[in-house]
């Protein structure tokens, strides 16, 4: 999964590729769309230091293909229409489009652990933040957009049985807290705290300078990012048809979330 900022940035840009009526809907339910752009990742934060049934839902939903997830979600929305739910789903589509396009390169590059999977994603976030003039990149709060009302949590939980609104609220809340913590100025203390969560958590701590271990992979990743953005409009159109009348999704949805 490209990290916090890459997904949020992608969703902001992808919204411009939607038809006007969907752009208006996304703007009305911006919180749901923004949270949707992080996909099922919030489950990983439900109880990050311990293995739990709810936390494992993150792995379960990442193993699903796009067809399995989006056709099932579309069926639920046809049975119980929800404009907020629709906005959330187009946000999740952003997450899926970016992950499914970038993950093959990330997995291949990190297969030998140099750089690590999360390390590369974090460095890609640092690159995009710097490119967008959000400097210093390591002091930006990537979790500031992660907010949901209780009603929003109820809406989101409907896409992830057997999750509940409480599951969603806790996962999103701790994810936002982690994002806020990652922007703290005391980097030594931050590194010490996140090392408690293991290698994956430690690699979430952004370097203050470019990470040379990732240098050769940033440009290819950015090209894949642009490719995913180009694909989004056609994928969104397919999702729209699926929502309207159950039209099956195409081969672009055959791969898993990763």
Model-found features: residue ranges?
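N-terminal leader/auxiliary helical segments
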Residues: 1-89, 93, 97-258
């Amino acid at each position: 999964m490209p990290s916090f900022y890459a997904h949020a940035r992608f969703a902001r840009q992808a919204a411009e590729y939607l038809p006007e009526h969907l752009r208006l809907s996304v703007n009305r339910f911006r919180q749901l769309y923004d949270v949707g752009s992080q996909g099922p990742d919030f489950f990983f934060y439900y109880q990050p230091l311990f293995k739990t049934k709810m936390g494992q839902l993150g792995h379960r939903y990442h193993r699903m293909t796009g067809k399995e997830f989006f056709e099932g979600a579309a069926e639920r929305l046809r049975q119980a229409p929800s404009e907020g739910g629709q906005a959330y789903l187009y946000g999740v589509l952003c997450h899926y489009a970016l992950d499914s396009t970038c993950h093959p390169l990330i997995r291949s590059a990190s297969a030998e652990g140099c750089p690590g999977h999360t390390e590369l994603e974090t460095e890609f976030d640092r690159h995009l933040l710097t490119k967008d003039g959000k400097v210093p990149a390591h002091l930006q709060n990537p979790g500031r957009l992660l907010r949901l009302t209780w009603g929003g949590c109820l809406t989101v939980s409907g896409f992830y049985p057997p999750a509940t609104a409480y599951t969603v609220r806790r996962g999103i809340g701790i994810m936002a807290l982690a994002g806020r913590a990652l922007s703290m100025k005391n980097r030594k203390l931050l590194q010490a705290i996140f090392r408690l969560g293991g290698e994956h958590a430690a690699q979430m701590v952004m370097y203050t300078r470019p990470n040379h271990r990732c240098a050769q992979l940033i440009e290819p990743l950015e090209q894949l990012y642009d490719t995913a953005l180009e694909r989004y409009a056609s994928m969104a159109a397919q999702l729209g048809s699926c929502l309207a009348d159950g039209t099956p999704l195409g081969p672009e949805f055959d791969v898993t979330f990763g």
